[in-house]
Amino acid sequence: MQRIHKVILYYVSLTILYRVTYLFDLEEPWSTLRPYTPYLFILAFGSYLGITLLYNVATTNDKPEAYVDLVKDIKEAQDALRSKGMTIED
């Protein structure tokens, strides 16, 4: 299955699940939150991605092999740009 098919399948599944919740009569605290659930899911997912990204950036120094690979890639990119006539400050 191609990636677009998976994305469409997840989107349709979540939409159906969200719409099915309107078939049930929920108690007061949940019925007031129901219209905002998509935004809450987006907020929670964004928070997860942000925290994961910040954690991985903060712990890069704990992985010396990743640091060496990153420095090597930067040097290769600088050499490639210099070979094309671009001046780069170190």
Curated annotation (Swiss-Prot):
Membrane topology note: Multi-pass membrane protein
Where would you say this protein principally sits, based on its record? endoplasmic reticulum
Q: Does the keyword Acyltransferase apply?
A: no
Question: Which Pfam families does this UniProt record tie to the protein?
Answer: DPM3
Instruction: Kindly state which keywords UniProt assigns to this record, in alphabetical order.
Output: Endoplasmic reticulum, Membrane, Transmembrane, Transmembrane helix
Q: Which GO terms describe its molecular function?
A: protein-membrane adaptor activity
- What's the superkingdom here? Eukaryota
What does this protein do, in the record's words?
Stabilizer subunit of the dolichol-phosphate-mannose synthase complex.
Protein name according to UniProt: Dolichol-phosphate mannosyltransferase subunit 3
Say which species the protein is native to.
Schizosaccharomyces pombe (strain 972 / ATCC 24843)
